[in-house]
Swiss-Prot record:
Positions with biased composition (Acidic residues): 67-76, 323-346, 728-739
Pfam family, one: Helicase_C
Top-level EC class as recorded in UniProt: hydrolase
Composition bias, Polar residues: 18-29
Record-given protein name: ATP-dependent RNA helicase rok1
Naturally occurring in which organism (per UniProt): Aspergillus fumigatus (strain ATCC MYA-4609 / CBS 101355 / FGSC A1100 / Af293) (Neosartorya fumigata)
Length: 739
């Protein structure tokens, strides 16, 4: 019996006006895969894609083809024929269906990519604009339009004086933007990877086994460019397709990993067929953290199964190249030790055998920057070795890899890849103009260093608004005043008591981000007994940071993915790239160091089009000068979402929050909020640290604990002093008894 229907039977309210709590819970990310992973869709674009997928033509067919179609329809629609004729027509229809199926299978295997109908430029523009995909040619205008400018001018007008050439008007900014815009063929479905782009049959089967059917926006735009190449003179069939260098800015959880793995694997499979004897590392994928690198390897192993391609995670002590100077050193050491005894020779040879590991036999190497640099330079003791076979370098989370922390290491790896046809692709959800300029200058330097006459296009693909959060999650910015207020608000999330509609309801599993490792440890110790023993107790909450060993980190990640851990307290170690598809929300216990970090943190929920994710950010009095950039991102995200009703960020709040100077932004990005920095320099900083301490213990209890620790330390010091002054330990000799 429905109580709502009973109480509202005299009204005109619809039965579905008040959704039940069970219905609202079904919209959580943890409930399962979204029906459509795309973030931006429109009916017009769907119509164009449907027509392209079924091979329909928009114009009416005329002539003999139309007459044949009419004859076929007349033959099929014979309603008044005899029963024998109907049976014969039915058997003929079955035979025709079988023949058509066999022909279709044969066509899928043997047909060329040119036989597949391509969209015209208007259709491509419609689809790309509807999905908010913008592709731009980043090269100089002289490289983009040299042929076009010459072809438009007649031969007589080519002979000009210098004065006339100087007087020619330059393109306006609007015309330059228009000249740089590119409209490549979009990917209609994953089936096209086999029919149009001729990827490996086994790779196509592996993609289908993973359940990928509808491409996301980033896959819709990048896969045709990386598999089919970029045609410099438009979509004409006569134009030569060239694989471009690519900069991709796409929202978190939009499928960037699959977008760069499929072309890399397919390229290596083709190379294996063309040159069977040549083996080595053909692609290098660089990621900023071990967690992200291991995740890429796990996804890659699902795709390379049965293809003959090997993908490997870089580990400490692995040998990547065979250095000639290593052999020279070994031979030199052998010559110098010829005069040594046989007993000394045996352990030295065994030591050499143990110390020299075999070279890694892999096609794709996934690594963090420092590990590969140390392997190529023998822990910075020798010049960098080269990777001559590498044809693709992929920088995942490129804005971090080309930032100050990893920049030198990443550029060293890039320079070590010496193949003249090396293609680079940079991927991230946030990418500043300085990163784009650095990538552009690095590619230009390589071109000059290797005297490359052939110009490769450099394209930038942006999905949605650049450097913005995904629109399918709900953002909450909560003022907690003090550290104790944040702790109280977090406990209210864990144990919701109020029934107000405006209150935030966040169900596990979720992530909690802090600024530093000590704060993450302190918050974990404070919350570990908040979950009742009936629900699993302290085993349901864990802390993850870079001070833990690799084994501990992988074990925590495994338990969190399995669902044994519900709440994970962590630092920005997990803020980038790591894919937790079932996370219901993210809590920023400490505000992020920059707007880009906020975008990546909240992007751990709402992945692959899942709706219902919540991002809660607590801020205190000390955080007020740094909050405006986060508030702006939330405001833009809500506008992009088209959210109706009351917004979480009001205009008066945006006007009241102070702007941050460039110097302060740089300081915040490097060190975080000053009040929460772990290093203490003065008494004033000590007082600030006390105010931002994560603890609910009283001052009396803390003093008693400190006294106890001091007594234990004093006892240890006394014991060590007595042992050092023990007469039995003196070195003085005994002269015997005097007579």
């Amino acid at each position: 019996m429905d109580a709502f229907k009973l109480l509202t039977r005299a009204t005109k309210l619809k039965s579905g006006a008040a959704p039940s709590s069970t219905q609202s819970l079904t919209r959580l990310p943890s409930t399962g895969k979204a029906a459509n992973p795309q973030l931006f869709r429109s009916s017009e674009a769907d119509k164009v894609l449907e027509e392209a997928s079924h091979g329909k033509k928009r114009k009416r067919v005329a002539g003999p083809e139309a007459a044949e179609l009419d004859d076929d329809d007349d033959a099929e629609l014979n309603f008044f024929g005899s029963s024998k004729a109907r049976r014969s027509s039915a058997s003929m229809a079955k035979e025709q269906a079988k023949e058509q199926q066999e022909q279709q299978e044969h066509r899928d295997d043997t047909s060329d990519a040119d036989d597949v109908d391509e969209m015209d430029e208007v259709q491509c523009r419609t689809v790309l604009n509807a999905h908010k995909i913008k592709v731009t040619d980043m090269r100089d205008l002289e490289e983009i339009q040299p042929v076009r400018i010459e072809s438009e001018e007649p031969k007589k007008k080519k002979k000009k004086t210098k004065q006339q050439e100087e007087s020619t008007p330059a393109l306006t900014k609007k015309e330059q933007k228009k000249a740089r815009r590119v409209y490549p063929q979009p990917l209609v479905s994953f089936k096209e990877l086999r029919t149009r782009y001729k990827i490996s049959r086994r790779l196509a089967e592996n993609i289908a086994e993973q359940g990928f059917t509808v491409p996301t926006e980033v896959q819709l735009g990048t896969l045709p460019l990386l598999l089919g190449g970029f045609k410099a003179s438009g979509n004409s069939k006569s134009a030569e397709s060239i694989e471009p260098d690519l900069l991709v800015v796409a929202p978190t959880g939009s499928g960037k990993t699959l977008s760069f793995l499929i072309p890399v694997i397919n390229k290596i499979v083709r190379h294996h067929h063309e040159q069977e004897k040549e083996r080595g590392i053909f692609s290098v994928i660089v990621a900023p953290t071990k967690e992200l690198a291991s995740q890429i390897v796990n996804e890659g192993r699902k795709l390379v199964h049965g293809t003959g391609v090997k993908i490997t995670l870089m580990k400490k002590g692995m040998r990547v190249v065979d250095r000639e100077d290593d052999d020279d050193e070994n031979s030199h050491s052998e010559d110098s030790e010829e005069g040594s005894d046989s007993e000394q020779d045996e352990p030295s040879t065994t030591r050499k055998k143990k110390g020299k590991a075999p070279i890694t036999k892999s096609d794709i190497l996934v690594t963090t920057p420092l590990l590969l640099v140390n392997a190529l330079s023998a822990n910075r003791t020798k010049p960098m070795a080269t990777l001559p076979l590498v044809r693709n370098i992929v920088l995942d989370e490129a804005d971090v890899l080309l930032d100050e922390l990893f920049r030198e290491q990443t550029l060293d790896i890039w320079r070590a890849c010496t193949h003249p046809e090396l293609r680079a692709s940079l991927w991230s959800a946030t990418m500043g103009s300085n990163i784009e300029d650095l990538a552009k200058s690095t590619i230009k330097e390589r071109k000059q260093a290797y005297d490359q006459t052939k110009s490769y296009p450099l394209l930038r693909l942006v999905v949605g608004l650049k450097d913005s959060a995904i629109p399918n999650i709900e953002h909450k910015l909560v003022y907690a005043a003090t550290e104790q207020g944040k702790l109280l608000g977090l406990r209210q999330l864990l144990h919701p008591a109020a029934a107000s509609v405006s209150d935030v309801r966040l169900r596990p599993p979720f992530l909690i981000f802090t600024q530093t490792i000590p704060r993450a440890i302190a918050l974990h110790s404070e919350l570990r007994y908040d979950i009742p023993a009936e629900a699993g107790g302290s085993s349901r909450i864990a802390v993850l940071h870079s001070d833990l060993s690799d084994g501990q980190r992988s074990e925590i990640m495994k338990n969190f993915r399995k669902g044994e851990i519900w709440i994970l307290v962590t630092t920005d170690l997990l803020a980038r790239g790591v894919d937790f598809r079932g996370i219901n929300g993210v809590v920023n216990y400490d505000i992020p160091n920059s707007a880009a970090v906020y975008v990546h943190r909240v992007g751990r929920t709402g992945r692959a089009g899942r709706e219902g994710g919540i991002a809660v950010t607590y801020y205190t009095k000390e955080d007020i000068p740094y909050v405006k950039s986060i508030a702006n991102i939330i405001d833009v995200s809500e506008k992009l979402r088209g959210k109706d009703g009351e917004k979480s960020i009001q205009k008066w709040l945006l006007d009241a929050l102070p702007d941050l100077s460039k110097k302060d932004k740089k300081e915040l990005k490097k060190h975080g909020v000053k009040a929460r920095q772990s290093t203490l320099k003065s008494v004033k900083d000590d007082k600030e640290h006390r105010r931002t301490r994560i603890s609910t213990k009283s001052g009396y209890d803390r003093r008693m604990e400190n006294k106890k620790k001091a007594l234990i330390a004093a006892s240890r010091n006394r014991k060590s002093k007595t042992q050092s002054t023990d007469p039995g330990s003196d070195d003085e000799s005994w002269d015997g008894l005097d007579g």
